[in-house]
């Protein structure tokens, strides 16, 4: 039977000093035999998805104490990708994921915590904490701050549901008046919470449900709704139970690596494909799987993408459906239920709250459940009042959305498409693969071929789009923005949003070794691997070349002869130390970012650090 990790600091004569320090934090003699639970919070006033978390850590802590544990809270950093977008601040977003994972490891291992509750929400925070949970492999429960309510705006006498992306597109549209743009801006983000569509933050919080590490509703119940309080309360009780089961009952099934095993990662990716989640989730699932020492790869994602249908389209794939609508249709448990009925899930996987995923679906899938409390839970509605306060309203819809033929969530027989919402493409320009969010691609451009216009920074591409140098039929290539080449693998939300504002969202393609915001839609192909800075073929593309894209057949190719590419490769290598770097780009790269660039791997490997490779170890 494993001993509580915390005994290292709470037992024995030689730990008198450590116990003295624990006592100074408020612990008493009776506490030294209890599990010490880390409450990993991520409150910050910089991020709307985290601005309401300040008191929620202590809410969880009180419940842990009531259940017989000792709670100790600490905080991680949190970057707002939307505020960091469009300038060099975005270089720091993805690297912050590694810092978050490390900071959790440092605090938990330094103080020998026995288990943890991870209070996350936005883009890199949930993935960073997930990586830490898989790395540490101690009992863990995830609970997010929840999505914000969708904005509502009246334009020309008609009410529209809007979000951050709508405001960005409107601002770049010269046909929109300043007054209308300001109205959109003021309406786009009305409450606290993660941005209201199926962007990266909400995608990841939904995936923790499929992985079995969070409670039902974690990904969909609104930040402002009183029902979300129950998730925080239950997280406190649940983690103490899991800790006791492991340390006192010798039950290793409750550990993250045994819950989120290979089959659970397949379930999560299946959900991701079915709901058209953010392409960033591919990076994060690969990174978390690596921490869990699982051989889960792009090949597995490709395999799953060929058999999983698209069962839901949510903003940004469509403009009028947001997370509040997904919740009304039964949330993530409803999508998982439809996938199960289609034979696409392994429901034998365990969860932190149920013996198996199958048992969880029997209770929480609204097409199976007879529980009135479950149905009431999924009727939680937006309050429609601007608020930065958690649990500030308790409004409910009169009815659930149970329409599986034309509703927000479809069954497999009425899927939006037989192909899922994410796809992996391969070809000479992406030997290790690249990612496209097919749920956001118009059917008319699933196959596309056009002349290339090459840019070696996001800024140059944006300038070209806004000055009308990009025309219908063009393939925009932005390179040297990968994990190493950026460094930091910037999101390309501004270029894709500006293409929309110019009426080119269905007339152009954008290809990059960088990545895209969860708010991106259109023919946007990212994570091209190997990246230009690693000698990838994308580094040899020139203006006027043609690139052909065939999503149904999962191919992408640079239509240039092998002989010409060999010649270009020789010319590039002849640049010596400057080879495989941008020719004219001026960018200040800090020592912190240089360190990330030295250690990072390809997007095809999750853009994680590989210290062994750096120092020549096997």
Swiss-Prot record:
Mg(2+) binds at residues 81, 123-124, 491. Pathway: Amino-acid biosynthesis; L-isoleucine biosynthesis; L-isoleucine from 2-oxobutanoate: step 3/4; Amino-acid biosynthesis; L-valine biosynthesis; L-valine from pyruvate: step 3/4. One of its GO terms (molecular function) is magnesium ion binding. It is an enzyme of class 4 (lyase). Its cofactor is [2Fe-2S] cluster; Mg(2+). Binds 1 [2Fe-2S] cluster per subunit. This cluster acts as a Lewis acid cofactor. [2Fe-2S] cluster binds at residues 122, 195. It catalyses: (2R)-2,3-dihydroxy-3-methylbutanoate = 3-methyl-2-oxobutanoate + H2O; (2R,3R)-2,3-dihydroxy-3-methylpentanoate = (S)-3-methyl-2-oxopentanoate + H2O. It comes from the Bacteria. GO terms for cellular component: cytosol. Keywords: 2Fe-2S, Amino-acid biosynthesis, Branched-chain amino acid biosynthesis, Iron, Iron-sulfur, Lyase, Magnesium, Metal-binding. Its EC number is 4.2.1.9. The modification N6-carboxylysine is found at residue 124. One of its GO terms (biological process) is isoleucine biosynthetic process. The active site is at 517 (proton acceptor). Functions in the biosynthesis of branched-chain amino acids. Catalyzes the dehydration of (2R,3R)-2,3-dihydroxy-3-methylpentanoate (2,3-dihydroxy-3-methylvalerate) into 2-oxo-3-methylpentanoate (2-oxo-3-methylvalerate) and of (2R)-2,3-dihydroxy-3-methylbutanoate (2,3-dihydroxyisovalerate) into 2-oxo-3-methylbutanoate (2-oxoisovalerate), the penultimate precursor to L-isoleucine and L-valine, respectively. Belongs to the IlvD/Edd family. HAMAP family: IlvD. Homodimer. This is Dihydroxy-acid dehydratase. It comes from Rhodopseudomonas palustris (strain TIE-1).
């Amino acid at each position: 039977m494993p001993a509580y990790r915390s005994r290292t600091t709470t037992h024995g004569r030689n730990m008198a000093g450590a116990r003295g320090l624990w006592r100074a934090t408020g612990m008493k003699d009776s506490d030294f035999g209890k599990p010490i639970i880390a409450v990993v919070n991520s409150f910050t006033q910089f991020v709307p998805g985290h601005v309401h978390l300040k008191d929620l850590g202590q809410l969880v802590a009180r419940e842990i104490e009531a259940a017989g544990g000792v709670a100790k809270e600490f905080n991680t950093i949190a970057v707002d990708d939307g505020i960091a977008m469009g300038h060099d601040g975005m270089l720091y977003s993805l690297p912050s994921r590694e810092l978050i994972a490390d900071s959790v490891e440092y605090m938990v291992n330094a103080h020998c915590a026995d288990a943890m509750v991870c209070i996350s929400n936005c883009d890199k925070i949930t993935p960073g904490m997930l990586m830490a949970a898989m790395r540490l492999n101690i009992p863990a429960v995830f609970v997010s701050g929840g999505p914000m309510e969708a904005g509502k705006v009246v334009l020309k006498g008609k009410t529209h549901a809007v979000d951050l992306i709508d405001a960005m597109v409107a601002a770049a549209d010269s046909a929109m008046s300043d007054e209308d743009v300001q109205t959109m801006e003021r309406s786009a983000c009305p409450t606290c919470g993660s941005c209201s569509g199926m962007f990266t933050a909400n995608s990841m919080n939904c995936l923790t449900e499929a992985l079995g590490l969070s409670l039902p509703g974690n990904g969909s119940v609104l930040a402002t709704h009183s029902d979300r309080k129950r998730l925080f309360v239950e997280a406190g009780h649940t983690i103490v139970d899991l800790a006791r089961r492991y340390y006192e009952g010798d039950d290793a099934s409750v550990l993250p690596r045994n819950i989120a095993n290979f089959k659970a990662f397949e379930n999560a990716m299946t959900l991701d494909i079915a709901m058209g989640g953010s392409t960033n989730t591919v990076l994060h699932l690969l990174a978390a799987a690596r921490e869990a020492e699982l051989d889960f790869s792009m090949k597995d994602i490709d395999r799953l993408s060929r058999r999983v249908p698209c069962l839901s389209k949510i903003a940004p794939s469509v403009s009028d459906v947001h997370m509040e609508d997904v919740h009304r249709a039964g949330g993530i448990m409803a999508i998982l239920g439809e996938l199960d009925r289609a034979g696409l899930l392994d429901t034998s996987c365990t969860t932190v709250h149920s013996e198996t995923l199958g048992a969880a679906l029997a209770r929480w899938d609204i097409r199976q459940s007879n529980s009135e409390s479950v149905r009431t839970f999924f009727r939680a509605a937006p309050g429609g009042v601007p608020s930065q306060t958690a649990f500030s309203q308790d409004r409910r819809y009169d009815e659930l959305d149970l329409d599986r033929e034309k509703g927000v969530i479809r069954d497999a027989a009425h899927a939006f498409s037989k192909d899922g919402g994410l796809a992996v493409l391969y070809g000479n320009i992406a030997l290790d693969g690249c990612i496209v969010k097919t749920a956001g691609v118009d059917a008319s451009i699933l196959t596309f071929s056009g002349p290339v216009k090459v840019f070696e920074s996001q800024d140059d591409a944006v300038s070209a789009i806004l000055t009308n140098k990009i025309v219908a039929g063009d393939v925009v290539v932005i390179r040297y923005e990968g994990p190493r080449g950026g460094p930091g693998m910037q999101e390309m939300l501004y270029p894709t949003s500006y293409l929309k504002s110019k009426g080119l969202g269905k007339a152009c393609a954008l290809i990059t070794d960088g990545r895209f915001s969860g708010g991106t839609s259109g023919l946007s192909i990212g994570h091209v691997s190997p990246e230009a800075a690693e000698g990838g073929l994308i580094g040899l593309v020139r203006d006027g070349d043609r690139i052909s894209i065939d999503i149904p057949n999962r191919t992408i190719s640079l239509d240039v002869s092998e002989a010409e590419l060999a010649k270009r490769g020789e010319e590039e290598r002849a640049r010596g130390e400057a080879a495989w770097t941008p020719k004219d780009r001026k960018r200040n790269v800090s020592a912190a970012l240089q360190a990330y660039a030295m250690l990072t791997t390809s997007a095809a490997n999750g853009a994680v650090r590989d210290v062994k490779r750096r120092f020549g170890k096997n």
